Amino acid sequence: MIFYEIFQVSFYQNFLWEKSVRLLFKVQRRLFKVSYIHDKKNLYELQKLIFQSNCARLLAIREVTQLSFNKKISGVDGKTTLNFLERFELNEYLRKNWNNWKPQSLRKRCVFDLNENLISDTISTISDRSWQVLIKFALEPVHEAFFHPFNFGFRYNVPIYKVQQAILLNLSNISFGSKKRILKVELNCNFSIFNYDYLMKKLIAPRNIKLGIFRLLELGFNLHFPENECQISTFSSLLLNVMLNGVENVHNCVRYGYYMLFFLRPMDNEKILANQILSLLYTRGIKKNSSKFLLVSNTKGFDFLGWHFKFSEKVKNGISAIPSLNNYQFFLNRVKRIVNNSNYGSVVKASKLYPVIKNWREYHKYSDLRSLSYSLFFVKKHAFSAFNSESKQDFYSSKRLLFKSFLVSESFNTVSKKYNFHILNCFSFGHLTFLSESINFFNKINLYFCVHCGMKCI
């Protein structure tokens, strides 16, 4: 039993972020258990306990003002930062008005996405964003218990490599992947028009919280997933996952954000499956013209999340994953833009190349990079000639800079050479797990928990 006194942390004592994270996770773990067994009475009590806790409110304010990527973007009030006293004033304001929240108007702005398309986005104020994070703390463990296991998009307990692992497992020789077809579904990124009533019915929260979310949506709050491929769980992505949950029950599939892959056997009809998907999306208020369908064969190959999957008899399991052509060209353009820039010196170029190359190789660490083009031999050669052309550098200093910029551990690409499926060795396989991830000033804290056996991993 968790008592209310554990959250009465005095402002005048030493307040530790690590302790507050563990206290919040303790209640979230209890909330995850209660929601799994459909105990609604204790569920609402634990949600109110999170809303009324000082730890959760201060962590929400800290995430918005210090840890968020959009912390320097202002809303309609023009505020980008808060001083020490303003944060405690915001904490008191959240304590008094969390159950009757009236959001302020949203500031609209136009930004470019990864495909260089101009899209409109809405920005809330700091107080509204803090309230959204506080609500996310209470809603996320409840809905994590009901999300489909093949929903891998923007959830803390599922890394992006599990998407690749699930696709390789479904298309391997063990699963007769050579006889399967793939139906790729891409949803529209703009969810400005959808069925509000359906979302309100699916949300598991007190009525006053639903009313605050409904007011926020009426102001024009856009529901969207983050553009990058990182696992960033936001309030908007949580609401979208709640609304799209259940599409995975139609057929054997993998969903990541807007993208879905349905694995069709030889006897499956793709037209019937497409009509079922469209009917489910229509009940959620999504237009039929906003989704794209593409039917491909496993032998011809297809692209998904920057990877190219193709059936190959040379591989032991029959399926190989390599970087897609668009992903590889985008990576090469970033490298060439740095190397060919005459405004940078060789030392600056090496420092800018290292994170780009490291992120690309880490993203494709379970892909087959044994090809000559993916070994980056010619990229190294071009970078070495650019370093050596500078008058301040000689052959040996250019070699050291090249080694510094392309320094990647040899542990990468060890699993991809054998294509062994280690999903059975994962401690969370067969267990319903909940993960709370917290980033403090020094390190990253991951708190795992299994609802069946109580297994923990810190």
UniProtKB/Swiss-Prot annotation:
InterPro entries: GrpII_Intron_Splice-Mob/Def, RVT_N. The keyword Chloroplast applies. One of its GO terms (biological process) is mRNA processing. Pfam families: RVT_N. GO terms for cellular component: chloroplast. It comes from the Eukaryota. It is found in: Plastid, Chloroplast. To group II intron maturases. This is Maturase-like protein 1. The gene is mat1.
